[in-house]
Amino acid sequence: MDKAKFIDVLSDSTGETAEKAVRAALLQYPDAGVQIRLHTRVRTPEVARPVLERAAQEGALVVFTVVSPELREFVHASTAELNIEAIDLIGSLIVRLGTFLDREPINLPSAMLPLSEEYFRRIEAVEFAVKSDDGKEPRNFKRADIVLVGVSRTSKTPLSTLLAQRGLKVANLPLVLGVPPPLELMEAPQDRVVGLTIGIDQLCEIRQARLRQLGMPSETNYAMREHVRQELDFANRLFAAHPEWPVVDVTKRAIEETAVIILEHLKERDERAKVVRSSLV
């Protein structure tokens, strides 16, 4: 049996940046079975040392984001002393930026920095996404930066949450077979509506898994292939009737990749709008 492998993520703040970077890199090693241990608000050598000693004992990889030069140097020295494989995710970047900008860094962990306008914008966007999930507030479609439209289990909610974390106000609407979308969708700016589609095989699998999770029988219309096909056909007819809506196929795509595609559509939309405005001047 293979020995368990650990990655200790050490941060003087929330550790979110480092953890996301590690998880993104681990996607290239599926089924690696690596366990990530997150150590947050590590701001003194006294707190860091036990983490590093345990990592040395267990042969763990240490990934760290530390802005304090003194603590960063301590971690570098300790990992060398203890013969630990370590990756400094942010230290060299801070130093190189200082050289490029000809300025000294303030050396404060992100959690200790003043709350910015962008922070409050993200909070507002997340609250908007929660209130506008699953078509709950159709009146919000007009206010949304993006309105995601698709049949059940096309990643509308996780996409809304992910995009909201970037400060975008996102609403989403589930398409139900035979039920026309609410008038509010047609009254919203049509270049903000994005259709989501998915392959029938994957959608059936996802829905069957969902039914098993809920302890429900799989022989229901929700997961039956013919019914699923009818739902997808219904959605595709709606998308075809609105060619101004970009349609994104989420089949076998991570939500992060789908989000990037949607953001690219937004960028193209904004660039077209700029061209139109400049032609009117």
Curated annotation (Swiss-Prot):
InterPro entries named in the record: Kinase-pyrophosphorylase, PPDK_reg
GO molecular function: ADP binding; ATP binding; phosphotransferase activity, phosphate group as acceptor; protein serine/threonine kinase activity
Residues annotated as binding ADP: G150, V151, S152, R153, T154, S155, K156, T157
Substrates-to-products reaction catalysed: N(tele)-phospho-L-histidyl/L-threonyl-[pyruvate, phosphate dikinase] + ADP = N(tele)-phospho-L-histidyl/O-phospho-L-threonyl-[pyruvate, phosphate dikinase] + AMP + H(+); N(tele)-phospho-L-histidyl/O-phospho-L-threonyl-[pyruvate, phosphate dikinase] + phosphate + H(+) = N(tele)-phospho-L-histidyl/L-threonyl-[pyruvate, phosphate dikinase] + diphosphate
E.C. code: 2.7.11.32, 2.7.4.27
Keyword list, A-Z: Kinase, Nucleotide-binding, Serine/threonine-protein kinase, Transferase
Its job: Bifunctional serine/threonine kinase and phosphorylase involved in the regulation of the pyruvate, phosphate dikinase (PPDK) by catalyzing its phosphorylation/dephosphorylation.
Similarity remark: Belongs to the pyruvate, phosphate/water dikinase regulatory protein family. PDRP subfamily.
Protein name: Putative pyruvate, phosphate dikinase regulatory protein
